[in-house]
C-alpha cells in the first residue's frame, strides 16, 4: 500500500447512508457569486444567501468531499443538506455556533 492510497471495493457506494437530510431553497440576494464547499456548516454561510437557516443548523451540503456549489447573483436553487456527523461540535466558520449543536 502506498501512503494515501485508497483501496475501494467494486460496485456502488452510497455516501452518507443513514444520515438525516433536509432540502432547502437558496437564493443569492447579493451582487457577487457565493461558493460553498462540501463540508461548510450551511447555517453559517454568507448572509447574502437567503434560505431557512434554522432548518440548516447542523447540516452541510450533501455533495462529494472536496466539491462545492456556486450561487450566482439572483440565482435560486434547491439543495440537499446532510447532517454533520461525529461529536457535532462546530467552531470557526462565521462564529455563529462555537460549540455543541
Curated annotation (Swiss-Prot):
Gene3D superfamilies found in the cross-reference section: Urease, beta subunit (2.10.150.10)
GO CC entries: urease complex
**Which CDD domains does this chain map to?**
Urease_beta (cd00407)
Pathway membership, UniProt: Nitrogen metabolism; urea degradation; CO(2) and NH(3) from urea (urease route): step 1/1
A single GO BP term for this record reads: urea catabolic process
Q: What InterPro entries has UniProt attached to this entry? A: Urease_beta-like (IPR002019), Urease_betasu_sf (IPR036461), Urease_subunit (IPR050069)
Catalysis: reaction(s): urea + 2 H2O + H(+) = hydrogencarbonate + 2 NH4(+)
Disulfide pairings: none
Q: Where in the cell is it found?
A: Cytoplasm
Q: Which GO terms describe its molecular function?
A: urease activity
Please provide the record's keywords in A-Z order: Cytoplasm, Hydrolase
Q: What is its EC number?
A: 3.5.1.5
User: What does the record note on quaternary structure?
Assistant: Heterotrimer of UreA (gamma), UreB (beta) and UreC (alpha) subunits. Three heterotrimers associate to form the active enzyme.
Matching HAMAP family = Urease_beta (MF_01954)
- Please give the family membership noted in the entry: Belongs to the urease beta subunit family.
What is the name of the protein in this document? Urease subunit beta
Origin species, per record, is Paraburkholderia xenovorans (strain LB400)
